Amino acid sequence: MLKIAVLVSGGGTNLQAIIDSIADGRITDTEIKVVISNNPKAKALERAAKAGIEAVCISPKQYADRELFNDALLEAVNVRGVDLVVLAGFMVVVPEKMIKAYRNRMINIHPSLIPSFCGTGYYGLHVHEAALKRGVKISGATVHFVDEGTDTGPIIMQKPVEVRPDDTPEVLQRRIMEQAEWQIMPKVIDLIAHD
């Protein structure tokens, strides 16, 4: 049984895709042990609680300095004995000691086809604004292992999505979530569960 922690900062739509995929059997032999958010108002915490999953808020604002926050975040994952850490819209820089502790056991979803529109500053709608400004015809999503760089870890899976001439950043974001992110993240977790 693969035990996972899902780290998320906002609405938790990728978290919901994972929860639903476990419920309907697209992800097997996997249990979400905890959902951790840095944002006490994150809807993801509600989604977790509704699904009967432990939901924890660990915010940098709760700690005197960043090192104390980093230690608390790592400890929160460690004490739950997880095998895989899933970053599903986690808008906090992951501590280097956590990356080292979970080397090749931490994955992230990014809303573009890496190496395009990734790295520092490319998150949320910024990614889709950049894609539209550049005039690309295809965008998509990538699941990758996390390393010390920003969106630089080894790619596990990608899925392309058509960019339409009348797209707005919001419309493109939604299409990439529905057609790519919510599909490939569950597939990758299931692959890892059976590796």
Describe the function of each predicted region.
Residues M1-D195:
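One-carbon transfer enzymes
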